[in-house]
Design a protein with these regions (language model features):
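N-terminal twin-arginine translocation
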Residues: 2, 19-22
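Short N-terminal or domain-adjacent regulatory/targeting segments
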Residues: 2-3, 14, 117-121
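Bacterial N-terminal signal peptides
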Residues: 8-20
Length: 259
C-alpha cells in the first residue's frame, strides 16, 4: 500500500510539473512600448501578427517605461520612442545589447482640430502661432524634459527660434497620446505630435510637418530585456520585423528601418 501511495504521489508531482511547464509556456511575452505605438501594435495583436497568444502590451511614455524596467518590471521586450531612454536602460545593464535594433522612424507634426481655420506654417515665426492660440489657448506638447515627443518638439522650436515665446503657452502632457487627446477634445487649438498619431486620429488635421533637420532623428529602438532572452521573445522581435508588421507600421504613418 505504501509503495502504491508513493507511486501515486510521484505521478501527481510529475503531472503538476508538466502542467506548470505548459502554463508557463502559454504565458505570452510582455511588450513595454512607447505610447505612440498603441494603434499599430493593437492592430497587429488583434490580427495575430505577433503570435498566439497575443503578447501583453503595456503603453506609456518611454521615460516611464525605462524607469520601470530598470526597477525590475516584468517586461520581455522594450520599444522606446527615442535612443536616449534605450541608452539609459542599457547603462543599467537591463537589456540584451546584441538584440537591440532600430525598428522604426517617425516625423513631428503640428496638428489642429479639423474645423480650424489656422494657416500656421513652420518657419513663419511665432506670430501666426500666437494668433492661432488666441488669448487663452494653449499648445499641447508632451513633457519636454523627459518624454521623447516633447524632447523633439523642444529641439525643433528652439532651432526655429520660437521656444522661449511659446513655452509659456504650452499645456504639457504625460505622453504624446495625451497631447493628441487635448486637441481632439478641443482643450487646445494646436498640438505637436508624431505623424503616426495624426494618422491614427481623424478628429485632427496636420497643419505642417517640422523639418527633419530641426530635431534629432526620430528613431524607435527595440531590444529584449535582460533575463527574458528566450525563444518566444526572439520570435516576437522577429515578428515585429516581418513584412506583415512592416505593412501595418507603414499604414499607421511610421517609417520602417529594420530589415
Amino acid at each position: 500500500m505504501r509503495r502504491i501511495q508513493r507511486l501515486v504521489a510521484c505521478v501527481m508531482v510529475a503531472g503538476a510539473g508538466a502542467l506548470g511547464s505548459a502554463m508557463a509556456a502559454a504565458v505570452p511575452p510582455t511588450i513595454f512600448a512607447a505610447a505612440s505605438l498603441e494603434p499599430a501594435l493593437d492592430q497587429m495583436a488583434h490580427e495575430g501578427a505577433l503570435g498566439t497568444p497575443a503578447p501583453r502590451l503595456v503603453y506609456a511614455a518611454s521615460s516611464a517605461l525605462a524607469r520601470q524596467i530598470e526597477n525590475g518590471a516584468p517586461a520581455d521586450l522594450f520599444i522606446s520612442a527615442d535612443e536616449r531612454w534605450m541608452d539609459d536602460v542599457a547603462r543599467h545593464d537591463a537589456i540584451v545589447p546584441s538584440t537591440r535594433i532600430d525598428l522604426l522612424g517617425n516625423a513631428l507634426v503640428l496638428i489642429a482640430p479639423p474645423h480650424s481655420m489656422s494657416k500656421v506654417q513652420i518657419g513663419q515665426g511665432p506670430a501666426p502661432w500666437l494668433e492661432a492660440l488666441g488669448r487663452e489657448g494653449h499648445l499641447a506638447v508632451a513633457l519636454p524634459d523627459s518624454v521623447p515627443a516633447g524632447i523633439y518638439a523642444k529641439q525643433s522650436l528652439t532651432k526655429l527660434g520660437m521656444w522661449q515665446v511659446l513655452q509659456p503657452r504650452m499645456a504639457m502632457t504625460r505622453d504624446v497620446r495625451a497631447a493628441l487627446n487635448f486637441v481632439v477634445l478641443g482643450q487646445c487649438p494646436l498640438g505637436i505630435v508624431y505623424r503616426s498619431d495624426a494618422v491614427s486620429e481623424p478628429r485632427v488635421k496636420v497643419l505642417a510637418t517640422f523639418p527633419a533637420a530641426s530635431h534629432k532623428p526620430i528613431v524607435y529602438p527595440a531590444a529584449i530585456v535582460k533575463g527574458h532572452d528566450d525563444d518566444a521573445t526572439r520570435a516576437l522581435l522577429a515578428a515585429l520585423q516581418a513584412e506583415r508588421a512592416r505593412g501595418v507600421f507603414r499604414r499607421w504613418g511610421f517609417d520602417v528601418l529594420a530589415h
